[in-house]
Amino acid sequence: MAGEIIGLDGIVSGQHTCSAVALEDAEVCVMPFDHIEDLSREFPVLQKHVHKIMSREIVRENGMMMLLGNMSAEERLANFLVNLIQRLFARGQSQSEFILRMSREEIGSYLGLKLETVSRTFSKYSEEGIIEVKQRHIKILKPDVLKQLVKSPNCK
């Protein structure tokens, strides 16, 4: 998503453990970490910002591990949509309506779910009036219900 930072996994070893694929036209700005470190020494406010970014990434990764380990399929998809809404809001975009750039299969791969499970869960959310789905166009009708699904101890 625009404005996001990738590649923090390669800071220690210089090798990245994963790859990224742009789902739409994108621009990438490559900045070697040693250059960022040098600039951070000159500008302490930059160092503080870099630490915040790294901390946010640690929290996100931890959340992803919890998601894959402890959440049901419904909770995973609800969490995915809530997270997407929050990221769109942070960029000044609509939280209630958006085009889903990932296919159902890609979402399943990301969430550790089968394509059929993702499709079935989207249909369930649609039937329950939580979201409206027209191919990749998603309209969030009940964001509070989605958030409750993520927090539900026994979402079935």
Residue ranges and their predicted role:
Residues 1-3, 10-13, 48, 80-83, ...:
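Short amphipathic alpha-helical surface micro-motifs
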